[in-house]
Each structure stands twice: as structure tokens, then as C-alpha cells.
């Protein structure tokens, strides 16, 4: 079957989502062609097939004149259907970069410069993990003294001058992020967008020599270009035909992926900048039964930090409990929290634990620590008395708390009393007036213990919950950036394959190229060409025409 369509263009597929529509695709006339053919594979030589196959295909013919084409010296006719025409500069939201001098864009888009910027940012981030962040000046005076500098030169003055004590909001770190973002935008504007613009332009080749110069080239002695177009369309190609010429492509999304990678990296940097300059952070230790206001705890850490309505919310600690391993070590802590508005109405209640925070109005409340607030005891039926527990410093990271119940004249020079020590909320060690061990009691048992004729009952152990509050407007942006980065990185591995064909009498010259999987491309082409039948007898009739 040989159909001459010149100067009209035959398009076998729907408009590609990345292709720019042209005028010749706007108005179409549907023509149904029923073609009954005896088919034979070109590889079969002169042997005829033992069976006949009927092919019925519906194709769309353009009813308007094709766009103006441009012929180059190497036998290539370029069309504007997929990006050649149209107004604008084709650069989208990066058009503002046109006001920059070309020399500045050339410097910013330099690949070694961008790599240097990324390594510098990575080094600063590593330095931020080594240097303690957010400590008091006295801490750095003692840790990095001038009389004994680290590495022979690094003192607290470096930290103070460069702002390394708050690395991720320091001007040097934010400046490097801005410089890297400028390099990414310049590279996208000067390199990636022009490449995509060229890739969107389909082009025809009108000479055998031009097609045979491609990475893959082959000639089918007796084959139809229309059959090749249908086979390519079935394999996912977008197919365009003009007269005896054919152009097909697939995988155009792979050409857009580098731009998507750059945009994703920009999102990550924007999110990180928002986190560093627009967040609030604070921590508080609250005994069970007390409350606090979020705004009293949260402190701004950047010049873009803006408080929200949630800062007026009151947090009430209903109860604090702890879970323990069989060995007695603390395994988990839980805080039953209620959030109340300005009118005292409860708007949210949740029991939080480590790795299970509470979120409200952009504020996240984390369970991070615990403390021992007080012991509630009775003495000879009097009380209860709330005895404040004080932390006792010991070696290592173990916690120990103690309190003292005075006995006798509290105004005497040498006041005696009962000492109580605890390392958690489940057991209390009691010592008598002479400092001798008297026994161990669990607060939940309510069992009395007699010391020097006095009956002591430990009614309750009141713990304090350690909470960390923060607002971070950059988190959703960073998550979106990482998601886009993973997606566009996968898309970038899609091969952008292009195929050209030219009908030269009964012979069909086919060539193609791809930007990835070059070793696999010849096998794919041979697989497709093996499906192209050899036309032995043709009988084409137009059965209907609908305008």
C-alpha cells in the first residue's frame, strides 16, 4: 500500500502532551481506508505467505496546509509542529534571566562552579554536625579557647564571626544556597530548555544519505511507509508523515526530566531556607497537672519567623506515665495533653509519646524527655505533703533524683529528716534519720513504712514531661522537593528515541537514534522492522468520507 499525501501531513496518533500543537492539527477530516493486502515478510525473500491477512486502519488527514518547512543542507526538512513556531521565548518562568548579561549567565551555568558550590554546602553541613548548635557563648569560650585552638587555629572567634553556632541560618550557608540556586536556574535557562525546545521540533529527512548517517540504518526492499507508521504507533511512538517521509519519536519526557531535577533541587533549597529563617523552636518541662501557653515557649530562630494563631493555645498536661523494660530501664514515656483555646474550650486531646507527636495549627509538639517533679507523702496520717525532687548529678547519663522530709524542729541548726532517692517513677528508696537504708516502696502500693516511730506512706510520684515545640514551614516544601527529585530522576532514564523513514519507490529506508540504551536500540529497531510486512498485492478503496 503506497499512499501519496504530499503536501498534506499524516499523523497517526493523538497530540503528545509535550508537543506544541500547530495549525495543521486543528482541523481534520476523517477518512476511513479499508486495505486488503497479501502480506509477506521481507526476510522471506520471494516466498509467498500461505495465508492472507486483512488490515483495517483509520487514519486522520489534515485539511489545512502544513506549516512552513525549512530545508537544511543535509537533506533534513524541519517542521514547526512540535515546538518550532509560536510566540514567546519558550523559557517559561525563567524569562527574567534574559535581563542578565550573557557573560554572567555563562559563569553561573559553569558545571565546575556548580559542583564546587555543592561540595562547599556539604562541607558546611558536615561542620554544622561537628560544632554544637545553639549553645551559649560561654560554652564556645570553654570548648574552643584561644589559648588552645582546635587544629592550631580554630577558636570561638571563628564561630562567632561566621555564625557557625547557628550554621543553617548563617549568612555564609544561606549565601551558598542562593548561589547554587542561581547556577541551577542559569543552567536550566541556557542549556536544558534549549535542548528540550530542539527535541520538541519534529523534522523530516528527504534523502537516503541523511537517514543512513543515523546511529541505526537499514533498508527494506519492498515495504510500505504506512505499515511502518502503524507498527511504530503500536509500540508507543508518536508518528508524523508528509508525503514519502516519516518521523516518529517516543520518550520525550526523558528530555524534560533534567529540568524537573533542577526544579526539585530548588524546592529542597527553598524549603531548607524557609526552615532556617521562618521557624520557631522551644522546649519546656511541665509537671503533671500544670499547663503552659505555646507562644511563651516558642522563640523565633529567623528573620522570617511569623507567629500564628496557634501560639495563643494553652497546653494542659493531664497525666504523664512511663513504660519499663523487664530490667527496670525506661522504655517509653507518654503525655496526655489537652489543647485549649482562649476561652478555655478543649480543641484537641491526644496522648503523645516518642515518635508520635501532636500537630495543631502548624505547631508540632514532640515528647523528648522526662523528669521527676515531686513526691506526695503522708506522715502519721498528716498531709499529703508535696516534696520537690531535685536532680542529683552522677557520672554517665543515668538519672537520679532526691528529696528530704524534715523531722523535728525545722529551725534548728542541724535539721534531721528522712531522705528519699529515686531513679524513675516506679520505686522509691527510703533512708532513716541516720542515713541508713530503711526500705523500698512503690507509689502505687500505698504501703506504709515505719522510720523512727513515724509511719510514712508514699502516696504518688509526680513526673514532669519534657516537650519540644517547633514550627517549620519548610518541611512540606522539602518533602515535595525530595518526592519530585526521586520521580524526575527515574524519568530521566527514559530513552528519547527518534526514527526517520523515506519511501524510495518500493524500498523503504529507515534510520534512528536514541540518547540512552544505545546498545539495546539496534535490537529494538530490528524487532520493529521484522514486523513490517512486504506488500504483494494491494487493493485500496475509500469506503466513507466524513467532514
From Swiss-Prot:
GO terms for biological process: cytochrome complex assembly. It is a multi-pass membrane protein. It is found in: Plastid, Chloroplast thylakoid membrane. The keyword Transmembrane helix applies. It comes from the Eukaryota. Keywords: Chloroplast, Cytochrome c-type biogenesis, Membrane, Plastid, Thylakoid, Transit peptide, Transmembrane, Transmembrane helix. GO terms for cellular component: chloroplast thylakoid membrane. Residues 41-84 are annotated as: Disordered. The chain crosses the membrane at residues 111-131, 170-190, 256-276. Residues 41-63 have a biased composition (Polar residues). InterPro entries: Cyt_c_bgen_Ccs1/CcsB/ResB, ResB-like_domain. It holds the Pfam family ResB. Required during biogenesis of c-type cytochromes (cytochrome c6 and cytochrome f) at the step of heme attachment. May interact with ccsA. Belongs to the Ccs1/CcsB family. This is Cytochrome c biogenesis protein CCS1, chloroplastic. It comes from Arabidopsis thaliana.
Amino acid at each position: 500500500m503506497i499512499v501519496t499525501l504530499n503536501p498534506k501531513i499524516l499523523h497517526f496518533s493523538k497530540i503528545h502532551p509535550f508537543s506544541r500543537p500547530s495549525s495543521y492539527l486543528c482541523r481534520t477530516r476523517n477518512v476511513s481506508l479499508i486495505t486488503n493486502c497479501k502480506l509477506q515478510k521481507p526476510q522471506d525473500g520471494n516466498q509467498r505467505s500461505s495465508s492472507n491477512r486483512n488490515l483495517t486502519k483509520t487514519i486522520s488527514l489534515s485539511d489545512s496546509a502544513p506549516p512552513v518547512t525549512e530545508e537544511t543542507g543535509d537533506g533534513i526538512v524541519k517542521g514547526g509542529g512540535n515546538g518550532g513556531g509560536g510566540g514567546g521565548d519558550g523559557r517559561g518562568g525563567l524569562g527574567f534571566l534574559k535581563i542578565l548579561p550573557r557573560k554572567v549567565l555563562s559563569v553561573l551555568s559553569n558545571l565546575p562552579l556548580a559542583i564546587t558550590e555543592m561540595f562547599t554546602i556539604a562541607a558546611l553541613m558536615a561542620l554544622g554536625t561537628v560544632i554544637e548548635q545553639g549553645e551559649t557563648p560561654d560554652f564556645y569560650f570553654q570548648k574552643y579557647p584561644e589559648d588552645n585552638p582546635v587544629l592550631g587555629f580554630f577558636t570561638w572567634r571563628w564561630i562567632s564571626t561566621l555564625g557557625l553556632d547557628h550554621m543553617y541560618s548563617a549568612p555564609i550557608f544561606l549565601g551558598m544556597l542562593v548561589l547554587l540556586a542561581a547556577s541551577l536556574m542559569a543552567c536550566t535557562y541556557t542549556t536544558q530548555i534549549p535542548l528540550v525546545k530542539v527535541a520538541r521540533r519534529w523534522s523530516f529527512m528527504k534523502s537516503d544519505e541523511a537517514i543512513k548517517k543515523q546511529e541505526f540504518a537499514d533498508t527494506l526492499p519492498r515495504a510500505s511507509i504506512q505499515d511502518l507508521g502503524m507498527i511504530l504507533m503500536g509500540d508507543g511512538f508518536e508518528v508524523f508523515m508528509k508525503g514519502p517521509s516519516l518521523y516518529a519519536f517516543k520518550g520525550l519526557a526523558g528530555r524534560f526530566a533534567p529540568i524537573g531535577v533542577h526544579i526539585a533541587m530548588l524546592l529542597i533549597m527553598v524549603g531548607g531556607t524557609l526552615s532556617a529563617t521562618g521557624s520557631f523552636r522551644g522546649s519546656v518541662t511541665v509537671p503533671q497537672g500544670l499547663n503552659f501557653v505555646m507562644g511563651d515557649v516558642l522563640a523565633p530562630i529567623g528573620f522570617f519567623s511569623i507567629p500564628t494563631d496557634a501560639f495563643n493555645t494553652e497546653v494542659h498536661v493531664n497525666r504523664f506515665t512511663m513504660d519499663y523494660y523487664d530490667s527496670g530501664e525506661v522504655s517509653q514515656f507518654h503525655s496526655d495533653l489537652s489543647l485549649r483555646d482562649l476561652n478555655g474550650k478543649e480543641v484537641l486531646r491526644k496522648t503523645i509519646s516518642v515518635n508520635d507527636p501532636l500537630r495543631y495549627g502548624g505547631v508540632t509538639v514532640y515528647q523528648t524527655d522526662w523528669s521527676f517533679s515531686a513526691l506526695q507523702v503522708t506522715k502519721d496520717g498528716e498531709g499529703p505533703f508535696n516534696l520537690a525532687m531535685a536532680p542529683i548529678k552522677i557520672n554517665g547519663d543515668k538519672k537520679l533524683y532526691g528529696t528530704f522530709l524534715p523531722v523535728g524542729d525545722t529551725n534548728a541548726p542541724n535539721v534531721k529528716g528522712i531522705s528519699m532517692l529515686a531513679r524513675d517513677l516506679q520505686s522509691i528508696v527510703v533512708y532513716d534519720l541516720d542515713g541508713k537504708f530503711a526500705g523500698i516502696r512503690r507509689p502505687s502500693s500505698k504501703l506504709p513504712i515505719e522510720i523512727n516511730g513515724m509511719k510514712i506512706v508514699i502516696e504518688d510520684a509526680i513526673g514532669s514531661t519534657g516537650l519540644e515545640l517547633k514550627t517549620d514551614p519548610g518541611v512540606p516544601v522539602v518533602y515535595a522537593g525530595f518526592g519530585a527529585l526521586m520521580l524526575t530522576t527515574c524519568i530521566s532514564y527514559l530513552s528519547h528515541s527518534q526514527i526517520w523513514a523515506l519511501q524510495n519507490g518500493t524500498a523503504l529506508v529507515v534510520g534512528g537514534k536514541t540518547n540512552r540504551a544505545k546498545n539495546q536500540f539496534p535490537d529494538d529497531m530490528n524487532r520493529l522492522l521484522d514486523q513490517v510486512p512486504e506488500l504483494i498485492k494491494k487493493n485500496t478503496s475509500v469506503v466513507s468520507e466524513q467532514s
